[in-house]
């Protein structure tokens, strides 16, 4: 994911209702960038950091990003002339997040994330690397979007009787919560969260016909998983079990017990491995309780 991809996808997301309210009467499909600078720059800041800057163009407030001393202005095309960026002011992000701005920004961010994830899902559905090793995932999306994406759960692979058949995360075809979901919700009760409101994706996107295929499938799916995580941009990633943990940590470890419960920072992500919540695992609940108590104290 890069700036240009963000720019192209945002253009598909703009609409009149997201334009700065006092300027909405001037917005049209021939100039979709109009009135979108601030909420656009907030999103760029989310993904790439740097500063948000403010200038005045023909007496109107205009915002852009300054990243490593490089001007990034994704909405400059709303003007039919070159912009003078000399007299700028660096803006405090929190001060410009008024209720209206936050509302429009959240809508735009949600649209962007959904479109970017859909593009990745198209890669998944067209992928043939594991054709003889898996049953293709039949759902129209490989990511479950929760209430927000500050915390993302990463599982091993779709369960045989799970959402690949029920089309409902953590539930079987009879709409009954899976045993893993029951255990995980008990753990989530510790941090006062709902598993059905928490974003989730699998390390392996399709259903491996044999467990021995998990390793090669994890390798084949790694770049797709990383792209999805870049789009979601979580504050904390919780990996469920050994395979997603090995796929995400940038170092090798001998025993899963050596890393479980510790927090690691990899590519600006905080990664927290836990024991898989499946009742098959002897530490599915008791081994995870101290981990979630720690999360409760820092989250």
Model regions and ranges:
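A structural boundary/capping signal
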Residues: 1-116
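A polyanion-binding, active-site-adjacent surface
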Residues: 117-299
